Swiss-Prot record:
Name the UniProt record assigns to this protein: Uncharacterized protein C3orf38
Organism field: Homo sapiens
Coiled coil residues, start to end: none
Function: May be involved in apoptosis regulation.
Pfam families: DUF4518
Length: 329
């Protein structure tokens, strides 16, 4: 492909993105890119020609036949959570930035439909190439987890096309707990227990209520901590959307425990989710999503979770909520 102006990571990324187009779209795009000078024998030939004759990744993505929705879905498959109303030129920039940041990484392939239970992908932390590094980078773990969790959950929204993977109880420990606090026209707190119930309640947010949760993964929106017992806590804040409307903000705490039977795999032990509708905030203000608790709050929360029983955990959550710390989610 000596004619192509694409880097290796751009080449692989565009190849995966083109996998979201059907055969007719691929053939039509090939005609456009090559000015009908190439007559491909099959889909593989057409993709090869498209990549070879594209002068740059941006030129290819700007083609009218590469629709905005296709780029959006591709980014979702890579765990990159973008608000649904994002314009095409901004989506292109997100894709270019993603490819530029990881030239040495093997990009995720666009997923095939899941048909068997054993094919379901659990959250796995990417293993560093440096095998000597025994310490877990919890900040990186938190970022990877959020990309995976929100990308998978948001992809279940029927307005965004086919899901990128199968959502279900397999991602949670069987005794997982969800505390869901939401403040819209009135305040409500609900508790859910068990992997099946928790996974269904979270699924209903995007599949039935059509919400889109967009996490803020900068230093203010994401905080992580760990305990000697192996529990990892991830605190994240972000905005809540439905279509082109921003409805409010959210704060969420996850408790993760490594699965001892599958290498580098973590499952969710508990979730505290707080959603605040715009109507519950000061008029005309929508603050930048940020986690309002500190590292010490997470570590203190740990000690209760890992040592005490369910009743004491709930008591700790209530105390934190009353005191105004970040554990109020």
């Amino acid at each position: 492909m000596e004619m192509s102006g694409l880097s290796f990571s751009e080449m692989e990324g565009c190849r995966n993105l083109l996998g979201l187009l059907d055969n007719d779209e691929i053939m039509a795009l090939c005609d456009t890119v090559t000015n009908r000078l190439v007559q491909p024998q099959d889909r593989q030939d057409a993709v090869h020609a498209i990549l070879a004759y594209s002068q740059s990744a941006e030129e290819l993505l700007r083609r009218r036949k590469v629709h905005r929705e296709v780029i959006f879905k591709y980014l979702a498959t890579q765990g990159i959570v973008i608000p649904p109303a994002t314009e095409k030129h901004n989506l292109i920039q997100h894709a270019k930035d993603y490819w530029q940041k990881q030239p040495q990484l093997k990009l995720k392939e666009t997923p095939e439909p899941v048909t068997k239970t054993e094919d379901i992908h659990l959250f796995q932390q990417q293993v560093k190439e440096d095998k000597k590094a025994e310490k877990v980078d919890f900040r990186r773990l938190g970022e990877e987890f959020c990309h995976w969790f929100f990308g998978l959950l948001n992809s279940q929204n029927p307005f965004l096309g086919p899901p990128q993977d199968e959502w279900g109880p397999q991602h949670f420990w069987h005794d997982v707990k969800l505390r869901f606090y939401y403040n819209t026209s009135e305040q409500n707190v609900m508790d859910y227990h068990g992997a099946e119930i928790v996974s269904l309640r979270l699924l209903s947010l995007v599949k039935e209520e059509f919400l889109f949760l967009s996490p803020n993964l900068d230093s203010h929106g994401l905080k992580c901590a760990s305990s000697p017992h192996g529990l990892v806590m991830v605190g994240v804040a972000g905005t809540v959307h439905r279509g082109n409307t921003c409805l409010g903000i959210f704060e969420q705490i996850f408790g993760l425990i490594r699965c001892p039977f599958v290498e580098n795999t973590w499952k969710i032990k508990f979730i505290n989710l707080k959603i605040m509708g715009e109507s519950s905030l000061a008029p005309g203000t929508l603050p930048k999503p940020s986690v309002k608790f500190e590292q010490s709050d997470l570590e203190a929360f740990y000690n209760v979770i890992t040592v005490c029983g369910t009743n004491e955990v709930r008591h700790n959550v209530k105390q934190a909520s009353d005191s105004g710390t970040g554990d109020q989610v």
